[in-house]
Amino acid sequence: QSGQHLADGCAGFRFPSDPITPVRFCDQRRKNTIPKWRIIDANGKDVFHGQFTATDIPVGNGLQLGTIKQTLASIKKPVKLTLLVSVNGYQNSWDFFVYPSAVTTVNKDILITQELNKEAINKLNEGGKVLLTLKKGTIKQQNGGSIAVGFSSIFWNTAWTNKQPPHTLGVLCNPNHPALKYFPTNYHSNWQWWDAMSHSNAILLDSVSKGIKPVVRVIDDWVTARSLGLVIECKVGNGKLLLTSVDLISENEKRPEAKQLLYSLINYMEGNSFNPATVLPWEKLISLVN
């Protein structure tokens, strides 16, 4: 099962795999084989394990060994897990992510908005905290809106393909940044970023502030090598702003990754670690969006 299908652990979700299908192109069938499976955590420790019924594996493909059904109710926090399936010493692996079913994405002290409206401006001027999660298409073309963000990387070379989309090469971040504490990640893209990359624009960081260090960076095409961001933080007016060009609000009841990332960002903003170093003038922020 592809990694973008994320599991809901606290609701007693049963992990269902697609049928496990071996492919064997040798001169003879493999007799009386017992395929085995394991689910491991990020440290390589077994969380669950099992095996399939002994079977003969013929030459060719199309044989279904069976499916894996495992209750995940014992998992209480967001984690990255890996499914391993092995047959006679040969092994394949698939990453997947488990998130709690119920997370709080409301905080009375933080204004969460998709628009830089009067309410958001007043909140910042009064010294408050604002989480601005922009809808796709909100960033102005010249500020990054024209850049085709994609989960998959560039095909071949945009200089040879007339700038065929996508124009980006995934994300780059610090997995230990407190803003990502409840959104397990490597320093690079994995399947849990597919949703974000599919609902976002890039922010051209130099149009905001030269030298600003984003919480999550987007890697640009090597031909243009622009400094791009997906999540940034700054001081605006008297307040603190966490700005993401990912739409984390629209239909997020159907998007567990969006809901979990939103929760992680809110949790970060609630703590003392949220203290942006960059001061952003109002005119820069206002000119960023349509």
How would you describe each model-predicted region?
Residues I139-Q142, N157-P256, S273-N290:
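Catalytic beta-strand/loop cores that center a nucleophilic Ser/Cys/Thr
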Residues E257-M269:
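Short amphipathic C-terminal alpha-helix that caps PH/PH-like domains
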Residues D8, F52-I57, T71-L72:
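Beta-strand-rich interaction surfaces with strong enrichment in secreted/lumenal proteins
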Residues W94-E115:
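Low-complexity, Pro/Ser/Thr- and charge-rich linker/hinge segments at domain boundaries
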Residues N88-S93:
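Short, exposed coil/turn segments at beta-strand boundaries within extracellular/luminal domains
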Residues F15-T53, L65-I68, P78-S86:
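Beta-strand-rich binding/interaction modules
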Residues K108-N157, K235-G239, T244, L265:
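Short alpha-beta junction capping motif
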Residues Q1-F13:
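Short, compositionally biased P/S/T/A/G/V-rich stretches that sit at domain boundaries
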